[in-house]
Amino acid sequence: MKITVVLVLLATFLGCVMIHESEASTTTTSTSASATTTTSASATTTTSASATTTTSASATTTTASPSSSSKKKTVTHYKRKVKRPKKVRKITRRRGLRSRNGRSSRNRRSEE
């Protein structure tokens, strides 16, 4: 039931849009606009697997502006380095051996 209501509303909306588009196409309005944009980007990521990992990335963006008679190029270089710490090793408990205070687990209980 809910789906049919949604479909009816969608069909009504599309019908109104199509009628509006057909009315807009019959009027004689002429608009001309042109724009040219050239964008070039490259990214490089290098990761080394040593004790300290360094990641570097660079990107280059070139944009041409069509508004002036001579084309101007803007080149932007980005370079970023991230230094990551060494991997932390998990400390495991030594079970069954001596505890920190020097007594074994058998001697902890009081003698009866």
Swiss-Prot record:
Sequence repeat copies, ranges: 31-38, 39-46, 47-54, 55-62
Tissue expr: Salivary gland specific.
Highest taxon listed in the record's lineage: Eukaryota
Signal peptide from the UniProt entry: 1-24
Residues covered by region (4 X 8 AA tandem repeats of T-S-A-S-A-T-T-T): 31-62
Feature: compositional bias, Basic residues: 70-112
Annotated InterPro entries: Ng_1-3-like
Disulfide pattern: none
CC annotations in GO: extracellular region
Primary site of residence: secreted
UniProt feature, compositional bias: Low complexity: 24-69
Annotated spans, Disordered: 24-112
Compartment list: Secreted
Keywords attached to this entry: Repeat, Secreted, Signal
Family: To NG-1, also to SGS-3.
Name of the protein this chain belongs to: Protein new-glue 2
Gene behind the chain: ng2
